[in-house]
Regions:
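Glycine-rich phosphate-binding loops of nucleotide-dependent enzymes
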Residues: 1-267
């Protein structure tokens, strides 16, 4: 059982193979959970992630037309786009940018669900279409400013340094207009200066945009510095959760990381 408080920075930590990325993949629809519930409560509504991805038909569906119709609808039209539309975005362990596109083009593509793409409006270049295009560009440059990449707007994404690409991924995710963002090892491979800059960006998301951040990270210094809450996984189970100061001295957590029994841990 795992829950994340709105407007917080919550770190999901644990040894390699604990199931952290699997949790992200289930939350965002890249894996389809075989059971249980994944509920994402935004400001406007609650989305059942498993449901909108398209669940298997159940025997009881045949005697419940409404339930059958709902399940059939999501089977036909459901998918990860509905998870994103509900307000959930993510980044990946391995950077996944459109490398042959410019930096700003990466951010414009991310807004395809928010921009008026009506074919007729585009053909006649209507005022609404031009306004939507202008708003998308303004939004892209706003997030480029937040991640300190305005000067790189017209460079190819594939030509950027590793640290810059990491920040661009966050900007691209934010252009989808999420209420919650899942960051999968965003500081991996970064030097201390880049990690500090990244930490400032993550705090900015929480403090100025009320974004809920769920973070997987192996840099314990960063985790302890920026997290409001920490959840610790080991072999797929939550073994501890609490404030950073509590987690630092939790015997179960120390045992999991050191590969020892709790009885062998001396604090």
């Amino acid at each position: 059982n795992l829950d994340v408080q709105r407007g917080s920075i919550t770190a999901l930590i644990g040894p390699n193979g604990a199931g952290k990325t699997t949790v992200f993949n289930c939350l965002t629809g890249f894996y389809r959970a075989s059971g249980g519930n994944i509920l994402f409560t935004s400001r406007n509504k609650t989305t059942n992630v498993i449901q909108v991805l398209g669940q298997k038909f159940q025997p009881g569906d045949w005697i419940n037309p409404a339930q059958f119709g709902q399940r059939l609808f999501y089977k036909m039209f459901g998918g990860t786009h509905l998870v994103n539309r509900a307000g959930l975005a993510r980044t990946f362990q391995n950077i996944r940018l459109f490398r042959e596109m410019s930096v700003v083009e990466n951010l414009l593509v991310a807004q395809h669900m928010r921009v008026n793409r009506n074919l007729l409006a585009g053909i006649v270049n209507s005022p609404a279409y031009r306004r939507a295009e202008s708003d998308a560009l303004d939004r892209a440059f706003y997030w480029l400013e937040v991640v300190d990449l305005v000067d790189c707007a017209n460079r190819l994404a594939g030509e950027m340094s590793y640290g810059q690409q990491r920040r661009l991924e966050i900007a691209r995710a934010m252009c989808t207009g999420p209420e919650m963002i899942c960051l999968d090892e965003p500081a991996a491979g970064l030097n201390p200066v880049e990690t500090h800059k990244l930490s400032s960006i993550i705090r900015f998301l929480r403090d100025h945009h009320d974004i809920t951040v769920l973070l997987i990270e192996h840099d314990m210094g960063m985790v302890m510095e920026i997290s409001d809450d920490i959840i610790v996984l080991d072999h797929g189970d939550v073994i501890a959760r609490g404030k950073p100061a509590q987690i630092q001295h939790d015997e179960k957590v120390i045992a999991a990381y050191l590969g020892t029994d709790e009885s062998e841990v001396t604090l």
